[in-house]
Amino acid sequence: MTRYTAPTQDIQYLLHDVLDVANDPTPGYAELEPDFTSAVLEEAGKIAGEVLHPLNAVGDQEGCVLENGVVRPPKGFKEAFDQVREGGWTALDLPEQYGGQNMPYLLGTAVGEMFSGANQAFTMYQGLTHGAASAILVHGTDQQKDTYLPKMFSCDWTGTMNLTEPHCGTDLGLMRSKAVPQDDGSYAISGQKIFISAGEHDMAENIIHLVLAKIPGGPEGIKGVSLFIVPKFLVKEDGSLGERNGVKCSKIEEKMGIHGNSTCVMDYDGAKGWLLGEEHKGMRAMFTMMNEARIGVGMQGLAQAEVAYQNALDYARDRLQGRSVTGVENPDGPADPLIVHPDIRRNLLDQKSFIEGARAFLLWGAQMIDRAERGKDEAAHGMVSLLTPVIKGFLTDEGYDMTVQAQQVYGGHGYIEETGMSQFTRDARIAMIYEGANGVQALDLVGRKLAQDGGKHVMAFFDLVKGFIKEAGTDGAMAEFTEPLKSASKDLQSAGMFFMQNGMKNPNAALAGSYDFMHLFGHVCLGLMWGRMAEASLKALAEGRGDANFHETKLATARFYMTRRLPATKLHLARIESGADPVMALDADRF
């Protein structure tokens, strides 16, 4: 059986030592005092470790069952969902007006990582509802908000997003689902959607589907797509539930992972729906949910890496195999523990340095979202737009790789289902695909985000890194951290310059290097985070604050990242500068 322990100490350190929330003027941050955040994180950690994680393997083994049109989730899910709902965890960072607790998104993200690490499939029921509610909050009418949000905030009603159809995934302009206007102002929605997470279940009274469809006679392609609210049960004027709507689950998808989440084929047969936002502006409204979801999916990559690492570390400490090359370290046993061997340590430090750097990056991104949304900071809004594809793509690619490395620590036992390690790998795999496949994230980064607003957001990022290096210093105790970061940042700038010089005359040159650019950017972001953590821990040690062992460990891990992982930027730059020719040399029929 696997275990999960919420990383509360690390999150507290990031909030208060690194992100310095006490001195952040963003509205709502004044209440984020150490005692308060500690209490929230400790309670959330208990739920994650004691309630959600014990159901993780249950969900994987049992999956969901479709019976007479109703999906039954795995044993224990419904009771756990009630417990999460009753504890107020479903609307931690949503507005009080509709029943939320109005805490910063930063704190909600920290709690979300814990829940996702404990049980990703379970947490998706809540997470998708959060995203759907956010879309209604931004684009809905007052009546729609009053009707749906209180129940969705509490998760008495859950939510979904319906985009994909059998013949169209990334290219939603090929969509065939139709929305025919009705005399009462509603629309009759017809079509089939696939891969719909949490599309049907019995853990909530109602399910509010957000569905993309085309109104007949509208513009061709993506410009003709609109977004609709389609409830499972129609809602009466007094808020009570009426008759069943014309939407049903016809099949549960058989998947590689996240078996505990009901991934459904949804059939719409003249279902009653209501326009959310403007006609033919559906993608604008849906992207409110999609952008939030992409941050959440990046979080999933980190979360699965964390839980896999915890179990791999336990195994490396307990499993006796071979002797240390420098001498026996466990004379009373038949062999030394795995963790004495350099390659196992390299493996574990790859994981540890990624996870802790990624957590800092994710929470910094959440802080930027708070500054943009709560503080109306336009610069922060631009930074979030720039970094969203990096958070989604880099964290899920690397997060998946780390679950594989954790599995590798177990050797053959990692390949056996009994240990539970394969579930982390299987569950992590989908995060590289849904909410925009990572190749698409890379194209978005290079094709749109770099040049957005005249390139001022990427220049702001370069200035941020440069400012940190200048302030921290390139000599003294910080030099071993700032010098590698400075070099990596130059690699990122060189890659950006290559795209500027070659992208217009040869678009394939930019597109062929986009994936490497996303990873190069991700490494620089984590390098910046490790620089900030090194600075914070050096300061804490100098002042005699906190746990000295914790801070020394941070510094050792920072050194590992700077010397062993950050140099990957040079590999990515070399690939980018090789241009399109190596990628495009073969005609399609020669593959």
Curated annotation (Swiss-Prot):
Q: How the protein is affected by changing residue 434 to A? A: Retains 51% of wild-type activity
Q: Tell me how activity varies with pH.
A: Optimum pH is 9.0.
Q: Keyword set for this entry?
A: FAD, Flavoprotein, Oxidoreductase
- Cofactor dependence: FAD
Q: Any idea which residues are catalytic in this one?
A: 435 (proton acceptor)
Q: Which GO terms describe its molecular function?
A: flavin adenine dinucleotide binding; oxidoreductase activity, acting on the CH-CH group of donors
Q: What mutagenesis or variant effect is reported for residue 170 to A? A: Retains 8.8% of wild-type activity
Note the effect listed for residue 448 to A. Answer: Retains 44% of wild-type activity
**Membrane spanning residue stretches:** none
Q: InterPro entries in the record, alphabetically?
A: Acyl-CoA_dh-like_C_dom, Acyl-CoA_Oxase/DH_mid-dom, Acyl-CoA_Oxase/DH_mid-dom_sf, AcylCo_DH-like_C, AcylCo_DH/oxidase_C, AcylCoA_DH/ox_N, AcylCoA_DH/ox_N_sf, AcylCoA_DH/oxidase_NM_dom_sf
How activity varies with temperature is described as: Optimum temperature is 40 degrees Celsius.
**Induction pattern:** Expression is up-regulated in the presence of DMSP.
Annotated consequence of substituting residue 197 to A = Retains 3.6% of wild-type activity
Q: What result is annotated for mutating residue 161 to A? A: Retains 37% of wild-type activity
What domain of life does the native source organism fall in?
Bacteria
What does the record give as the reaction this protein catalyses? 3-(methylsulfanyl)propanoyl-CoA + oxidized [electron-transfer flavoprotein] + H(+) = 3-(methylsulfanyl)acryloyl-CoA + reduced [electron-transfer flavoprotein]
Q: What is its EC number?
A: 1.3.99.41
Q: What does this protein do?
A: Involved in the assimilation of dimethylsulphoniopropionate (DMSP), an important compound in the fixation of carbon in marine phytoplankton, by mediating the conversion of 3-(methylthio)propanoyl-CoA (MMPA-CoA) to 3-(methylthio)acryloyl-CoA (MTA-CoA).
Q: Its family?
A: Belongs to the acyl-CoA dehydrogenase family.
The annotated subunit structure for this chain is:
Homodimer.
Description of its domains: Each monomer consists of four domains: an N-terminal alpha-helical domain, a ten-stranded beta sheet domain, a central alpha-helical domain and a C-terminal alpha-helical domain.
State the protein's name: 3-methylmercaptopropionyl-CoA dehydrogenase
- Organism expressing this protein natively: Roseovarius nubinhibens (strain ATCC BAA-591 / DSM 15170 / ISM)
